[in-house]
Amino acid sequence: MGNSAKKFPPIQGGALILLTLALSLATFMQVLDSTIANVAIPTIAGDLGASFSQGTWVITSFGVANAISIPITGWLAKRFGEVRLFLVSTFLFVVSSWLCGIADSLEALIIFRVIQGAVAGPVIPLSQSLLLNNYPPEKRGMALAFWSMTIVVAPIFGPILGGWISDNIHWGWIFFINVPIGLSVVLISWKILGSRESEIVHQPIDKVGLVLLVLGVGCLQLMLDQGREQDWFNSNEIIILAVVAVVCLIALVIWELTDDNPVVDISLFHSRNFSVGCLCTSLAFLIYLGSVVLIPLLLQQVFHYTATWAGLAASPVGLFPILLSPIIGRFGYKIDMRILVTISFIVYAITFYWRAVTFEPSMTFVDVALPQLVQGLAVSCFFMPLTTITLSGLPAHKMASASSLFNFLRTLAGSVGTSLTTFMWYNREAVHHTQLTEHINPYNPISQSFYHQMNQFGLSDTQTSAYLAQQITSQGFIIGANEIFWLSAMGFLGLLIVIWFAKPPFGTQH
């Protein structure tokens, strides 16, 4: 039996700075890897002789394995120790990244991505719990702010970096960049934390719970990733996945409430702040990550931006978190955490409303970048206060389980958000396309006048119809995006009420 991490004195000085950097880099690396491959799928699929739809399994395979492994992190950490599990997971992440980079077939790449996703699961929750358990109580806010910044900034830089790599060098470097970063994280963490292992508990594994978890979460993630490709519930495959996911997840909750050694600690929801924090974080991340995917898609499909320029237009959101996170971490505890979250949700609502009324066919790069820049204020006040509220009052020995469940729900919400947003966007485009097309008929003098003008410019009626169809599609996508932005603004205003159900005091001193 090892010692509980709680018994070790806090780390101080240069070692503390190095540890913070290493754990934050581990988080950044893992979150970056979940988005960096998205824009490179056409390049990867073409290079490996596969279709685009087959290439999407490069994303799906990682997402499914990752979603399954995150919630069992708490049990694994108790069984093998938090430090040991973190070091092994990070090292295996490095190895699997290298294997992904040298893969010479799509099948091999998918297998290595499954391994990569599975070993990546424990990295984020353990980096969070190790940071909190080894920091001086008075400095935990700053540590959490710096760590949180990587969670919300990494998805922005993933498409930029992935686009640049796929455009300029071999796509394998999307994965190779993890190797030096990951090895540095392992060496620094081992040097500082090697003798600070958490308590090891030899408890039996909950086999039934594990099977239900794998089936439920795996089917749910597959459904979310493949839904649009398979036309959602018009596909028997998607219906079967949905039924299996719902049945298994309901059975999982019932089973875990009665099992003595649950693989997922449902009892954490007895904590009011944990429940409120998970709900607010999950719903907010669902909306936020949906926009992270939607805005580059809109810019590429309608405004013909390259992947790199679409990423650059979205990137200003990272400026304020980089500048303000240390300040909020240093002074945030002087005010009610709920106030910081309220400010965040209000700014989120304002920026989504801003997009809803300004996104139009003639908008410029600045029109996209400016709301992104202001939204950075919301991001700065978002993750650190919500994480603090969620974990407040929990004992140290439950921190790994709480962090893994919290991050699992956040990750799952992000998957739901991206799938739901893209589904709504394409669906609303189809609706608006039909509505707008109805106005193009022989009885509408405006449309007939337009055809006449185009004839004078030398275009035939067929060419004019093709041009109008293209314009209607673009308008449909823009209107659909604006409707989603409106709905997102309303969602954040609704969350303003929920966050005030959290109960002070807040803090990570346990």
From Swiss-Prot:
**Disulfide partners:** none
Its record classes its membrane topology as: Multi-pass membrane protein
Protein location: Cell inner membrane
Matching SUPFAM superfamilies, A to Z?
Answer: MFS general substrate transporter
Q: Which residues lie on this side of the membrane: Cytoplasmic?
A: 1-7, 53-56, 113, 166-168, 225-237, 300-308, 360-375, 505-510
- Please name the GO terms of the biological process aspect recorded for this protein, alphabetically: response to antibiotic; transmembrane transport
- Give GO MF terms, alphabetically: transmembrane transporter activity
Q: Organism's domain of life?
A: Bacteria
- Where does the UniProt entry say this protein principally localizes? membrane
Under the cellular component aspect of Gene Ontology, which terms does the record hold? Answer: plasma membrane
Alphabetic keyword roster:
Antibiotic resistance, Cell inner membrane, Cell membrane, Membrane, Transmembrane, Transmembrane helix, Transport
Q: Does the keyword Transmembrane helix apply?
A: yes
Q: Topological domains (Periplasmic): residue ranges?
A: 29-31, 78-91, 135-144, 190-203, 259-278, 330-338, 397-483
From the record, give the transmembrane residue ranges: 8-28, 32-52, 57-77, 92-112, 114-134, 145-165, 169-189, 204-224, 238-258, 279-299, 309-329, 339-359, 376-396, 484-504
What PANTHER family does UniProt report for this protein, alphabetically? MAJOR FACILITATOR SUPERFAMILY MULTIDRUG TRANSPORTER MFSC
NCBIfam families (UniProt xref): efflux_EmrB
Query: What is the annotated role of this protein in its UniProt record?
Result: Confers resistance to antibiotics.
What family is it from?
A: Belongs to the major facilitator superfamily. EmrB family.
In Swiss-Prot or TrEMBL terms, this protein is called Multidrug export protein EmrB
Q: Which gene encodes it?
A: emrB
